[in-house]
């Protein structure tokens, strides 16, 4: 009898967390919150790398057909705005001057695009993130997308451009912020 009670208590101690944990995990995990956390991290990383290139080198490009460093930043800003508009938010999108050459204007465009994205993501719920996004000409190769997929896609696109920016910095003798050591 003593062993049966001990066994019952042991089972209770071991099984109860398993019964409660999924419910707690569901409360803690959220599509919208996960995407917002990733978006915020990406903004911080991109603002640092964008500012890392000396102003007199913003026009640098490794080969003639490529975008220069400043254009890469503006390309990210424009893509952020264009893709986030697909999430049907009431937020007013910033206007990106794709011909900007001033460091201050370029960095402001990038920051504004991420701030716009932050507001758009915050306006979503897990349910709206699973709804279809507005269609664009890009759907011909990607197919219809959920709003969550659009956010994921634009972040993937940004990481691609980030990788190119790392090379631009290194070709100019600049260590990317993420690689710097104290």
Feature locations, PLM:
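Bacterial N-terminal signal peptides
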Residues: 9-23
């Amino acid at each position: 009898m003593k062993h049966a009670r001990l066994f019952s208590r042991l089972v209770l101690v071991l099984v109860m967390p398993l019964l409660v944990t999924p419910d707690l995990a569901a409360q803690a995990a959220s599509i919208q919150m996960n995407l917002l956390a990733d978006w915020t991290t990406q903004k911080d990383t991109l603002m640092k790398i964008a500012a890392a290139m000396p102003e007199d080198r913003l026009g640098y490009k490794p080969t003639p057909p490529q975008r220069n460093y400043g254009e890469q930043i503006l390309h990210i800003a424009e893509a952020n705005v264009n893709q986030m508009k697909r999430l049907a938010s009431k937020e007013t999108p910033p206007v990106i001057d794709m011909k900007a050459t001033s460091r201050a204007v370029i960095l402001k465009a990038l920051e504004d695009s991420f701030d716009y994205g932050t507001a758009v993501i915050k306006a979503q719920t897990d349910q709206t993130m699973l709804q279809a996004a507005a269609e664009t000409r890009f759907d011909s190769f990607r197919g219809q997308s959920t709003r969550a997929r659009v956010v994921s896609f634009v972040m993937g696109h940004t990481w691609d451009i980030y990788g190119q920016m790392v090379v631009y910095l290194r070709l100019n003798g600049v260590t990317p912020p993420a690689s710097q050591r104290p």
